Amino acid sequence: MTENTSAEGPQTLRELQIANRQLGARNAKLVELLQASRTKLEEINGRLEALAEPPSTYGTLLQANRDFTAEVFTAGRRMRLMVSPHVPQHELVPGAMVRLGEGQQVVEVTGQPDFGDIAQVVEVSGDRLIIADKVGEEYVVKAAGDLAKEVVTGDSVIVDRKSGWAFEAVPRAETNNLILEEVPDVTYDDIGGLGQQITQIRDAVELPFLHPEIYTRYGLRPPKGVLLYGPPGNGKTLIAKAVANSLAQSDSPYFLNIKGPELLNKFVGETERQIRAIFEQARRVASSGRPVIVFFDEMEALFRTRGTGVSSDMESTVVPQLLAELDGVEAAGNVIVIGASNREELIDPAILRPGRLDVKIRIARPDAFGAAAILSKHLDASLPIDADFSAATGSNEAAAAALRQSIVDELFTRDEEHRYVTLHYADGSREDLYWADFVSGAMLANIVDRAKTLAIKDALHNGANGTDGLRPEHVNAAVLAEVGDSEDLPDTTNPAEWARIYGHGTKRVVDIDVHKV
């Protein structure tokens, strides 16, 4: 009996130890499960309590006081509310959106409102802004945070009219599309056939900017504005861009490129607002000493002669706004306005008088010499030229010159084959116009592009072992295609208007005969 007990004792002890360890592991697992259940239960209880809470209201913080109260605009009225001690004092910034808990106390700061009405800044006065809505009504609001330091006149801001706060500056896409602030990459060397006109505008624009001290010595005031006018497609916009680029070589100019038709807006006063914003921006930049060029393309679309409107007659308000801004340009010093138009007779005379757009430069159609100069910018020896043609002419340079001359000869020949239209005047006389009378820089560039396309198609068709490069037949075909595509453009329903646009309206035109190519 003793032997059995002593034999079984150690074995029983080991079993008890194993069982004890197993029970301990189970107990630890039960404790872990119990803790997880308790956490889950607390989470569920928290959700139930949150569901039982009344809905929160929000308001705009007007002012935080030292006695843990705050002035809050909520539900359309101003209220003084208690601030929860859990809310950090440094977050209580006027203009911030706050959440109100049960009992109408501030329990959380949720940041700045990111929605509201859009208004235009008219004036910045300390931490207050004078703003105007889309119908022109002005009112005063407070600027939240550092907004007053960030905005300038003409900027758009998000406002809450009821609380009287402006929260954030908003970029206006339509205004940004009208303004190209970067300096264009067009130089005078890129413009051919307009040497005299380039000299005129350089004398009018660049000299006063580059040598102001000499103008002061002579008591000569620089011109406020320049009008570039003439038939379409002859380089008016290119010249304005080249002016800005030239000034950039000695200074850092600001180029505002305004597309006239895009400023038009159906809302009363909106076009005038944008004009004010543009010139305010120009004056602000000019005050730092930088030259500013405000370029109005298609000027006749905006500033037509007053009294010629058919319905709204918006010219009666838009033109005076521009006149007021032009009269204010002199005070700015470094601002000059350049306008471009192919219908200069439609622009209000008050804009064109001396003292506003002082210098008027006609950009006429190129003659044969000017056309060759323009073509030299688009067709030179750097282009692929047919090897046989290059060998026949002696060099790539000679071949390119021959191709250019071929285009000029084809366009500027005045014979029956090259007659374009016949104008019939009211006095019974008539006048024949030829291809040469309708040549423009844009047309010449398009002819070269057509010739390149034909050469590319031939190269693809002939393969690697075929001929490659520009040939005379390419440029000749391009000329015929360009003229042929234009033969349906003359407006026979209103011949006088069409002739005037294209610079041939010396007398009253009553009819047009178009001669097919």
Curated annotation (Swiss-Prot):
Residues the record lists as binding ATP: G233, N234, G235, K236, T237, L238
Keyword check for Transferase: no
Family statement: Belongs to the AAA ATPase family.
Keywords on record: ATP-binding, Coiled coil, Nucleotide-binding
The name this protein goes by in its record: AAA ATPase forming ring-shaped complexes
SMART domains registered for this protein in UniProt: AAA (SM00382)
Source organism superkingdom: Bacteria
Coiled coil: 25-53
A molecular-function term among this protein's GO annotations: ATP hydrolysis activity
One example of a Gene Ontology biological process annotation: proteasomal protein catabolic process
The keyword NAD belongs to this UniProt entry's keyword annotation: no
One Gene Ontology cellular component annotation held by this UniProt entry: proteasome complex
Pfam families cross-referenced by the UniProt entry: AAA, Prot_ATP_ID_OB_C, Prot_ATP_ID_OB_N
Subunit annotation: Homohexamer. Assembles into a hexameric ring structure.
Species of provenance: Corynebacterium jeikeium (strain K411)
InterPro entries: AAA+_ATPase (IPR003593), AAA_ATPase_domain (IPR050168), ATPase_AAA_core (IPR003959), ATPase_AAA_CS (IPR003960), NA-bd_OB-fold (IPR012340), P-loop_NTPase (IPR027417), Prot_ATP_ID_OB_2nd (IPR032501), Prot_ATP_ID_OB_N (IPR041626)
